[in-house]
Amino acid sequence: MKVFTLLAAAAASIATVVGYETAEKQFVDILIEYQIVQTPEVTKNDVAQWTNGDEVTLKYNIVNNEEKEVTVIGVTGQFTNPVTNEIVTNLTQGRVGPLSIPPGQSASFEQNIGIDVIPNNYELIPQVFFAHDELIKVIPCRGQLATVADKSISFFDPRLIFLELVLLASFAGIAYLAYQIWGKKYIQGTAPVKVKKTTAVTSVPAGTGVSTTTTGASGYDVNWIPEGHLKQKKTKKVA
């Protein structure tokens, strides 16, 4: 039978509810075991693989081998560094029951743990609070090694697509604004200027009887040329 060493300090919130305090270490004959509901195949000798944002459920089974009744009143825990055993973060205390367990009997309850830590290797050490012999006692459970990683984001994730659309719209707006302020003026200033050809027109006073009509592609006035020069000579073909 496994005997656990009890920690001396009790949580203030739980002590207030029950009305007892502990001053020194105690020894009790209580067996506590748990398994991970989502991955029951993971044992204490394995390394669990967790992702930030997931919720892990621990199902506890407690066997009371004491001669008196014990009452489970809460559960907490901590993530520690498996190499240095330093505490990295504490879990939020959760109320249980109170769940009374008579001598020689067992009981079960569950604890939900939200995973939100810096990606790394950890050891999860749950702790169960219970009342025994008019004292609040804490039993640290076995540790569970775990590797925590960030959740991978898919390229087709709606949140990522929305962010991409917002960025594209922002870049398009900035580009359009820059064109209106600087680009448009720059293009107008550097574009080649097309020169239009003009034809000189000679003005003639009205009433002079002079016509300035030109013909075809000759480009000269035919009114002053004698008619004889304008007629084409006809030649007869002699047989």
Swiss-Prot record:
Transmembrane segments: 161-181
The encoding gene: IRC22
Organism: Lodderomyces elongisporus (strain ATCC 11503 / CBS 2605 / JCM 1781 / NBRC 1676 / NRRL YB-4239)
Purpose of the protein: Is probably involved in a pathway contributing to genomic integrity.
Pfam families in alphabetical order: TRAP_alpha
InterPro entries to which the protein is assigned, alphabetical: TRAP_alpha
Primary subcellular site in the record, as a coarse category: endoplasmic reticulum
Keyword Signal: yes
Alphabetical UniProt keywords: Endoplasmic reticulum, Membrane, Signal, Transmembrane, Transmembrane helix
Cell compartments where the protein resides: Endoplasmic reticulum membrane
Protein name: Increased recombination centers protein 22
Lineage start: Eukaryota, Fungi, Dikarya, Ascomycota, Saccharomycotina
Lumenal-side positions: 20-160
Signal peptide start and end residues: 1-19
Membrane topology designation: Single-pass type I membrane protein
